[in-house]
C-alpha cells in the first residue's frame, strides 16, 4: 500500500457521540480525493485519554488510533502529527463534518507554492438567533484577520520546523499556529489563505450550553492573543468540561 499524501488528524476526548459521523464524513471526502487527484488520505484519531468508547468506535470505522495520555488539545494534535505519514497535514475536530470536496481543495492549496497553509469557513449544523449571532461575529473576525482555523492545514515540514502546536496553552493553539505559519510564509512570498468552495459543518453543543456573553468574551480573548489567559487551564475549562460533550 502506498504512503498517504495527506494525513487528517482528529483529536478526540470522550467523543463517542460524534466520532463515527466525523470519520464517515472524512472517508467520503477521501474517496473523492483518491478519485479526483489519484492520492490517498489517512485518518488518524488521537484518543486523548478517553473514558468512553471513542477509541473503539474510531477503530471500528477504520481510522488509525494513537493514544495521548495528557489532556491538552495541542499535545493531542502534535501526537497525531508525529504519527502522520503524509507530507500534508490537516486537523479536524471530532464534532465536525466536511464537504466531500474538501480534501481535494486542501491538496490543491498545498500544491500551490504561494500558499503556506490555510483553513476553512465553519458552518454550524443548525441555526437559531444565538448561534447565528455568534458565527456572524466569528466570520467577521476571520474576514478581517484572514485566519480561519476550521480544518487547518499545512505542509508537515513547515509544521515540524515550527515545533507544532504550542503545548503550553489550553485553547486557541490553532490560532497561534496560523499566525506562526503566516510569519514564516511572509518572507517566502507565501500567504495563509482560506479554502474557497469547501467548508466544515460543526456541532453547536458548546454554544447551546454556554451563555452567549461567555462565548464572545473568550472569543475576543483568544482572538487578541491574551497569552496569560490561554495558558490557564481554569480559564479554558470550557473546552475541557465533560458536561459540554
Where are these regions (language model features)?
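Acidic donor-binding/catalytic loop of UDP-sugar-dependent glycosyltransferases
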Residues: 53, 92-108, 179
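A conserved acidic beta->alpha catalytic loop
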Residues: 25, 43-55, 96
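Short aromatic/hydrophobic "clamp" motif used to bind/position activated sugar donors
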Residues: 89
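Short, well-formed alpha-helical segments that are part of the catalytic scaffolds
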Residues: 15-35
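A short, conserved alpha-helix in the catalytic core of glycosyltransferases
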Residues: 158-161, 169-189, 193
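Cell-envelope/extracellular polymer assembly enzymes that use nucleotide-activated donors
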Residues: 5-7, 42, 176
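Conserved donor NDP-sugar-binding/catalytic core segment of glycosyltransferases
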Residues: 100-130
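Glycine-rich, basic loop-to-helix element that forms the pyrophosphate-binding segment
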Residues: 68-84
Amino acid at each position: 500500500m502506498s504512503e498517504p499524501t495527506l494525513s487528517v488528524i482528529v483529536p478526540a476526548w470522550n467523543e463517542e457521540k460524534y466520532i463515527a459521523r466525523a470519520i464517515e464524513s472524512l472517508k467520503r471526502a477521501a474517496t473523492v480525493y483518491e478519485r479526483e487527484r489519484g492520492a490517498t488520505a489517512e485518518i488518524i484519531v488521537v484518543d486523548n485519554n478517553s473514558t468512553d468508547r471513542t477509541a473503539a468506535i474510531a477503530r471500528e470505522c477504520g481510522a488509525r488510533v494513537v493514544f495521548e495520555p495528557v489532556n491538552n488539545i495541542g499535545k493531542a494534535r502534535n501526537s497525531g502529527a508525529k504519527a502522520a505519514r503524509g507530507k500534508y497535514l490537516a486537523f479536524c475536530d471530532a464534532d465536525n463534518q466536511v464537504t466531500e470536496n474538501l480534501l481535494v481543495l486542501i491538496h490543491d492549496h498545498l500544491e500551490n507554492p504561494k500558499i503556506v497553509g490555510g483553513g476553512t469557513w465553519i458552518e454550524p449544523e443548525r441555526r437559531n438567533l444565538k448561534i447565528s449571532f455568534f458565527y456572524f461575529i466569528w466570520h467577521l473576525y476571520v474576514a478581517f484577520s484572514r485566519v480561519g482555523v476550521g480544518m487547518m492545514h499545512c505542509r508537515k515540514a513547515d509544521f515540524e520546523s515550527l515545533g507544532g502546536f504550542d503545548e503550553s496553552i489550553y485553547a486557541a493553539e490553532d490560532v497561534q499556529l496560523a499566525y506562526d505559519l503566516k510569519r514564516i510564509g511572509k518572507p517566502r512570498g507565501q500567504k495563509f489563505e482560506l479554502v474557497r468552495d469547501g467548508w466544515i459543518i460543526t456541532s453547536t453543543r458548546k454554544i447551546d450550553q454556554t451563555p452567549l456573553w461567555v462565548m464572545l468574551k473568550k472569543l475576543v480573548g483568544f482572538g487578541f492573543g491574551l497569552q496569560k489567559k490561554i495558558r490557564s487551564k481554569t480559564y479554558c475549562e470550557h473546552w475541557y468540561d465533560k458536561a459540554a460533550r
